[in-house]
């Protein structure tokens, strides 16, 4: 415990012009969420913050709209003019005055881990100022860390202001620091903009404080991946690749077999049982729970769903906000839409769409069917081409099918309608009324045959010789 009040301050006022986007840089997506959302979540997971605040400028309204649902308690501070990172922090002076420590971070550092931020805050609580650094093989574009003879940080020199010797330094400023209130309030007003950019650099705070004899602790990351930011699309893709590899390692730790670890995308949280096998080009979104022994074949997309043990999801199937039971068989090319529950042993075959339906135990919808707003009992066979006609142009209506029902191919069930236990529906029927239990229902017209029928013949075309 710190026994101190802590403000988490995120600087998100920059335009990010190199992204060539109509959105601010902070809203560029990593792992299905804006970069800034990853950082805010990591800050919260430290369990050390009293409040969070975001300094915004460019397209601030869009930033607030994107984050307000997941981060409703964040304070918003507007930077009226884009005068640099030092000026951005100065904009939050009223909030800084209310907290013992302020944790400051740039919005485009989505891979920082909560444990790293915890360590930085504890160091700042002890020394008054702690700054996060990393060793980079290619430090181009980053501010370089300068140490004094005591080992403390005495300056940060930005790339555009660095001399040749300083540019050879590989230890860089990550863009995360924690500073006690007294020093921020004392030294922020002393920042100057005598640099190549004509801006007030937050990094200049280091030299001002060190010059007065204060020790500034540097905390160097074990993995430089946490320090990665993104100023353009190529760097954004590199961030996504590191994020994906983190998620892959989480799956390995759960005992999942990935046929090709480089060809999976995970945008969310995956909770997997033992002996799960995932083939290439699978996309997992939101919260996905996968039981023991499940196989997910290539090309599938699963979002916010639960898959029971020993189920197989065949190739190119899409499952969205649904629950699949144990030992089920789904696909290939099946689409399972929200509010669908498929019981144990259910079989949903190729080119079948299920929406807001309950499919009973060991029931089968094998081919080329649409089942919407329906409740199907146990051990039902739904023939190829069966459609539940659930929409009348104004409202949706339900279809109820009992246990042990057999529905022939190319059948239309016009809702609202009920097919009771044990009934059989003849192929090609259009069912508009309820069907009693253990009966055969069919609406097939009588077969008509015309003898000696000849199909119309095409007329031969004669070429014009002229």
UniProtKB/Swiss-Prot annotation:
CDD domains: GT2_GlmU_N_bac (cd02540), LbH_GlmU_C (cd03353). Its EC number is 2.7.7.23, 2.3.1.157. It catalyses: alpha-D-glucosamine 1-phosphate + acetyl-CoA = N-acetyl-alpha-D-glucosamine 1-phosphate + CoA + H(+); N-acetyl-alpha-D-glucosamine 1-phosphate + UTP + H(+) = UDP-N-acetyl-alpha-D-glucosamine + diphosphate. Gene3D superfamilies: Hexapeptide repeat proteins (2.160.10.10), Spore Coat Polysaccharide Biosynthesis Protein SpsA, Chain A (3.90.550.10). UDP-N-acetyl-alpha-D-glucosamine binds at residues 11-14, 25, 79, 84-85, 143, 158, 173, 231, 337, 355, 370, 381. Acetyl-CoA binds at residues 384, 390-391, 409, 427, 444. InterPro entries: Bifunctional_GlmU, GlmU-like, GlmU_C_LbH, Hexapep, MobA-like_NTP_Trfase, Nucleotide-diphossugar_trans, Trimer_LpxA-like_sf. The keyword Repeat applies. Residues 255-466 are annotated as: N-acetyltransferase. One of its GO terms (molecular function) is glucosamine-1-phosphate N-acetyltransferase activity. Its cofactor is Mg(2+). It holds the Pfam family Hexapep. Its main location: cytoplasm. Homotrimer. In the N-terminal section; belongs to the N-acetylglucosamine-1-phosphate uridyltransferase family. This is Bifunctional protein GlmU. It comes from Dichelobacter nodosus (strain VCS1703A). The gene is glmU.
């Amino acid at each position: 415990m710190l026994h101190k009040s802590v403000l988490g301050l995120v600087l998100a006022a920059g335009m990010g012009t190199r992204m060539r986007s109509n959105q601010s840089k902070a809203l560029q997506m990593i792992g299905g969420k804006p970069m800034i959302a990853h950082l805010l979540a990591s800050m919260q997971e430290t369990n050390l913050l009293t409040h969070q605040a975001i300094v915004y400028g460019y397209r601030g309204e869009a930033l607030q709209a994107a984050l307000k649902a997941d981060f409703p308690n964040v304070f918003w501070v507007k930077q009226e003019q884009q005068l640099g990172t030092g000026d951005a922090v100065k904009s939050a002076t009223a909030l800084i005055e209310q907290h013992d420590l302020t944790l400051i971070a740039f919005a485009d550092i989505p891979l920082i881990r909560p444990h790293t931020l915890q360590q930085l805050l504890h160091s700042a609580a002890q020394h008054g100022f702690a700054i996060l650094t990393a060793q980079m093989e290619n430090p181009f574009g980053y501010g370089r860390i300068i140490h004094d003879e005591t080992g403390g940080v005495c300056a940060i020199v930005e790339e555009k202001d660095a001399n040749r010797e300083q540019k050879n330094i590989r230890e860089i400023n990550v863009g995360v620091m924690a500073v006690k209130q007294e020093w921020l309030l004392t030294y922020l007003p002393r920042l100057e903009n005598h640099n190549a950019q004509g801006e007030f650099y937050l990094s200049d705070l280091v030299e001002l404080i060190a010059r007065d004899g204060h020790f500034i602790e540097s905390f160097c990351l074990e993995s430089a991946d946490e320090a990665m930011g993104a100023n353009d699309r190529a760097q954004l893709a590199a961030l996504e690749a590191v994020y994906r590899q983190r998620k892959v390692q989480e799956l390995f730790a759960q005992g999942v077999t990935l046929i090709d670890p480089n060809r999976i995308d995970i945008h969310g949280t995956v909770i997997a049982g033992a002996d799960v096998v995932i083939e290439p080009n699978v996309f997992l979104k939101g919260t996905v729970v996968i039981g023991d022994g499940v196989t997910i074949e290539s090309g599938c997309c699963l979002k916010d769903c639960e898959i029971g043990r020993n189920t197989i999801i065949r190739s190119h199937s899409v499952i969205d906000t649904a629950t699949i039971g144990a030992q089920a068989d789904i696909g290939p090319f099946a689409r399972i839409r929200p509010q669908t529950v498929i019981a144990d042993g259910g079989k949903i075959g190729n080119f079948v769409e299920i929406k807001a339906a309950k499919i009973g135990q060991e029931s089968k919808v094998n081919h080329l069917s649409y089942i919407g707003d329906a409740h199907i009992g146990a051990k039902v066979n739904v023939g190829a081409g069966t459609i539940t006609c659930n929409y009348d142009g104004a409202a949706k209506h339900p279809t109820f099918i009992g246990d042990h029902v057999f529905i022939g191919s190319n059948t239309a069930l016009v809702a609202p309608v009920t097919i009771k236990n044990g009934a059989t529906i003849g192929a090609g029927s259009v069912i508009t009324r309820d069907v009693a239990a253990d009966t055969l229902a069919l609406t097939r017209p009588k077969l008509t045959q015309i003898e000696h029928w000849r199909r119309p013949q095409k007329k031969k075309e004669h070429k014009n010789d002229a």
